[in-house]
Amino acid sequence: MNTDALKKMAAEAALRYIQPGMVVGVGTGSTTNFFIEALGAAKIHVDGYVASSIATENRLKAQGLNVLELNATGDIPVYIDGADEADPHFRLIKGGGGALTREKIVASAARLFVCIADDSKDRPMLGKFPLPVEVIPFARSFVARQLVKIGGSPTLRSGITTDNGNVILDVTGLDFSDPLRMEETINAIPGVLDNGIFAHRRADVMLFGSAGGVIERKA
């Protein structure tokens, strides 16, 4: 099975968490795109979907699905999104698609966070994938220097402006022995909007597509 088939398998398995009448949060990225396609085919009568990016909003609308503003919604029972890495403690690295800040906001607003991925994202420890950090452009050089001081090697992601009007620094070389502490340390740097460590708001359920079928884990 190729990677896309595994992603699609995990995405379709997430449909079991969607019930009629819900408001559903939807993430951003290649695996989530398969989930959006599955939603369009399933035609579950939910109240609406809260998108974590403009790209996701456009994809949902292209499927004829009702998109709601986060500020106009109350309870979000479930949020479905992918990950670039996941560890055994349900902590994640996200943001390869550049939507990490809005993803973290919608995930934090949801009661249940279901993460979908192919099984190559299942790692014993975070840190192989470069960590995305969303930075206000004015502070880019300053933030990069601070990241170097804590052991990181930041690279500006070229050609990318986030939906919030910011830039992304992709950082390698960081110590992920304590992801929660690293998340807090980076977010304390002035000029950082957020980073792609999801340790405060971990996933509640992991669905990994694998050659043997869907692997489901619950926190």
From Swiss-Prot:
GO cellular component: cytosol
Active site: E103
Reaction catalysed by this enzyme: aldehydo-D-ribose 5-phosphate = D-ribulose 5-phosphate
GO terms of biological process kind: D-ribose metabolic process; pentose-phosphate shunt, non-oxidative branch
InterPro entries per UniProt: NagB/RpiA_transferase-like, Ribose5P_isomerase_typA_subgr, Ribose5P_isomerase_type_A
GO molecular function: ribose-5-phosphate isomerase activity
Pathway: Carbohydrate degradation; pentose phosphate pathway; D-ribose 5-phosphate from D-ribulose 5-phosphate (non-oxidative stage): step 1/1
Keywords associated with the record: Isomerase
Disulfide bond annotation, renumbered to this chain: none
EC assignment: 5.3.1.6
Leading EC class: isomerase
Tree of life domain: Bacteria
Pfam families in UniProt: Rib_5-P_isom_A
Gene3D superfamilies: 3.30.70.260, 3.40.50.1360
Binding residue positions for substrate: T28, G29, S30, T31, D81, G82, A83, D84, K94, G95, G96, G97, K121
Subunit composition and interactions: Homodimer.
Free-text function comment from the UniProt entry: Catalyzes the reversible conversion of ribose-5-phosphate to ribulose 5-phosphate.
Family: Belongs to the ribose 5-phosphate isomerase family.
Official protein name in the record: Ribose-5-phosphate isomerase A
Species name: Acidithiobacillus ferrooxidans (strain ATCC 23270 / DSM 14882 / CIP 104768 / NCIMB 8455) (Ferrobacillus ferrooxidans (strain ATCC 23270))
